[in-house]
Structure formats: structure tokens, C-alpha cells
Amino acid sequence: MRILVWGATGSVGSRVVAEATARGHSVTSVSRSGPDHLRGDASNPEDVARLSAGHDVVISATRPQDGREGELVDTAKSLLIGLRGSGVRLVLVGGAASLIVPGSELTLMESPEFPAALLPIARACAAQYALVRSAEALDWTYVSPPALLEPGTRTGRYRKGYDHLVTDAAGESSISVEDFAVALVDEAEQAQHIRQRFTVGY
């Protein structure tokens, strides 16, 4: 399978590249900078169309800097335009804040415990998801991480959810970045959630 990864130098993207490569896929890694990657800007539809041509799946794991959260929506729009009608599937890494907290009717960002400092990125992720949901002429999958996503160990194990946070017996919602990458590459291979959002956790 030919997979193109946007945001290949980031925490999630670099692990997606490693996971997909280890499985024997042909991986093209793209970044705004870095000598070992193709140069490209995911917020430019022409770059998206040009670099994605000839691939089976695009996995986008870009993340904006603090204060530039609006780039999430701009980048999603660019990906949708650049891939429209191409036959290339899009697996897009999103946010967790719009997931519903189990046992409540509130989303994570609506819960009283949600840090105010994270509201800008949370709102941007919610807008990103709303935009992607309206996309036509494109097979997309939106993947929300759990509440806690940190570097750790690859176990190859995870559980899936859809609109609710995946939590363990202690009520924690987490996964290692390595296992999150496993879930992303699994979806690239299996195409189980076309035009759907899903989430994962332990």
C-alpha cells in the first residue's frame, strides 16, 4: 500500500511513518521542514493534490502551534479540496474534546474539569470535525485520540469507540502514541470507518 503522511516529523506522524514502514508499506513522509522528508504544506491544496497523486491513503497528523489553532480548519479544508475526486482516502487525526464523557451528556470540552487553556485548540478541533463531516466526493475517516495521548510502549492493543471517550475500569482515557499509530495504520489498511469518526483507548 502507498501511504503519504503529512506532519511526518511530529509526535504522531513520526510514529505512523515508523509503523507503516515496519509493515512493509511504501511510505512518503511530508513536512514543512526537515532534510529527510518531502517538503510540502498541507494548507496548500495544490501541494496536497500534487504530493498525494499515486497514493492509496493519506494520513494527516499535522498540529498547529499555540496561538495558531485556526490553522486546523484551514488545513482540513485544503486536504478536502486537494483530495476531492482523486480516489485517495484520507485518515485525519483530530481532537478528543468533542467526544462525550461516559455517564454524562457533556462533551469533554464542556465538562467542568476541562482546562480553560485548552479551549482554543478544543474549539478548533470541533470546527475541524464539523467541516470534515460535510465533505463529499472523498472517502475520509476522522480519528479522535483519547483524553491522554503520550509517548510510551507499543503493545498493538486498543479498544474502539465512536462518539464517546474510551475509558478503562478506573475511568481513565489514554493510549500511547505508539498504539495510536497502530490504530491509524490499521484503519489505513482495513478501511473500516469510511466517512465516520472513531476513537481509541485502552
What are these regions (language model features)?
Residues A130-P151:
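Conserved beta-loop-beta element that borders a ligand/cofactor-binding pocket
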Residues G24-R32:
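Conserved glycine-rich Rossmann-like NAD(P)H-binding loop of the short-chain dehydrogenase/reductase
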Residues K77-P120, A130, S134:
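Conserved Rossmann-fold NAD(P)-dependent oxidoreductase catalytic core, especially the SDR/UDP-sugar
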Residues W140, E187-Y202:
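Core catalytic loop region at the nicotinamide-binding pocket of NAD(P)H-dependent oxidoreductases
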